[in-house]
């Protein structure tokens, strides 16, 4: 039987999300640094949204909308999870007393921890080369969680 190469299944092209998370993972291999990221990245996302919300709620909403469009272009399941996280975050801003001060303090502490994690890693944070990686950090963690759970993303 003669088989044309075009008839054979082609290797799946790597999706953009896999490329971005793979690049991000290059500077996030040390177990201590990864553990620091598991704790700090969600807090940093919450703090970033809270600080924007304190400046003006619509600044926060615009950033959330733009971020969710970015996530939707990469992966619908990831966008759904991030939408849930951001919705819960924004809801919390209405009940956390002095949310701006709490966010500012937590932001400073978690970024210090992140830089300590990267010092242990021996590599500088990814976002210093490309700001896009500030949005990839949460995906790095979600991809790990989805893979561990055997869920498609």
Report the location of each language-model feature:
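Transmembrane alpha-helical segments that form the membrane-embedded catalytic/substrate-channel core
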Residues: 67-78, 107-123, 141-145
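Helix-adjacent hinge/juxtasegments
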Residues: 57-95
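Helix-coil boundary and interhelical linker segments in multi-pass alpha-helical membrane proteins
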Residues: 13, 49-61, 89-103
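Membrane-interface helix-boundary signature
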Residues: 26-36, 56-60, 75, 96, ...
């Amino acid at each position: 039987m003669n088989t044309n190469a075009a008839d054979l299944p082609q290797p799946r092209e790597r999706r953009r999300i896999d490329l971005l998370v793979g690049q991000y993972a290059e500077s996030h291999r040390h177990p201590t640094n990864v553990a620091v990221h598991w704790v700090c990245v969600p807090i940093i996302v919450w703090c970033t949204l809270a600080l924007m919300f304190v400046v003006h709620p619509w600044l926060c909403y615009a950033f959330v909308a733009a971020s969710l469009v970015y996530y939707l272009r990469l992966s619908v399941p990831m966008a759904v999870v991030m939408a849930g996280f951001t919705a819960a975050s924004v809801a919390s801003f209405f009940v956390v007393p002095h949310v701006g001060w709490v966010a500012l303090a937590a932001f400073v502490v978690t970024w210090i921890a992140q830089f300590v994690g990267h010092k242990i890693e021996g590599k500088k944070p990814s976002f210093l080369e490309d700001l896009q990686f500030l949005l990839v950090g949460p995906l790095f963690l979600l991809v790990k969680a989805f893979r561990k759970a055997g869920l498609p993303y």
